[in-house]
Amino acid sequence: MTSELIPFHALPIYKESTDFVLTDEEKSVIVNGEFRKALSKQGNAISKSAEVLDDEKLVRLKTHILTVFNDYVTNHLQIENQFYLTQSWTAINHKGDAHHSHIHPNTVFSCVYYVQANSGDLQIKMPVSRIQEGYNLSYNVVQQNIFNSRTINISVRSGVIVIFPGWCEHQALPNEDDAPRIILGTNYFLTGTFGDYDNKDEITIR
């Protein structure tokens, strides 16, 4: 297992590569559900269900994803606030298909587990690079990096988990492999009390 915290745009983007693979029974639950085609022409098929991980046959997968996410919150973000799982869904890209650029509304963090992936990076995009914020200068870039680029491509393979802020615009680049690219996505929101009564900023989210 290897992990990497990617500070693109000073954001806590996390990638963990593992050898965690699904059993045939678990994978059949993922791929045999009902799917709908996205409105874009890129052919991305998304599960109709937004509670895929509620299936009892996927308890092992759910435990794995939540363990990685909770470790991310505790050991990388280093905050004590509580998050809860709001949605879980699957998406499939066949050869030549991609996942259109989008964000996840009503979400603090999003997580993608790659059930099967041999091709197609996850791309995260910002309106401008970090050093363009404020003045939006057109710099003469010698070599792109996390400071002077408005996009970052994260290479993915089967078993990889990527966590990022849900408001970040992102897309999956085309799958050039003969085998379908299969992902399971999850979203998270906060619960609990934040702020302080005396500071007049206390709020409770249930």
Predicted regions and their residues:
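Non-heme Fe(II)/2-oxoglutarate
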Residues: 1-81, 89, 98, 202-206
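Short conserved micro-motifs at the rims of enzyme active sites and ligand-binding pockets
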Residues: 27, 175, 195-198
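A generic structural signal for short beta-strands and their flanking turns/coil linkers
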Residues: 84-88, 107-109, 120, 180
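Short beta-strand His + acidic residue motifs that chelate non-heme Fe in jelly-roll/DSBH
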Residues: 99-102, 170-177
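Residues in well-ordered beta-strands of folded domains
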Residues: 17, 89-91, 112, 123-125, ...
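A short alpha/beta connector and helix-capping loop motif
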Residues: 178-188
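Catalytic core of non-heme Fe(II) oxygenases with the double-stranded beta-helix
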Residues: 93-163, 190-202
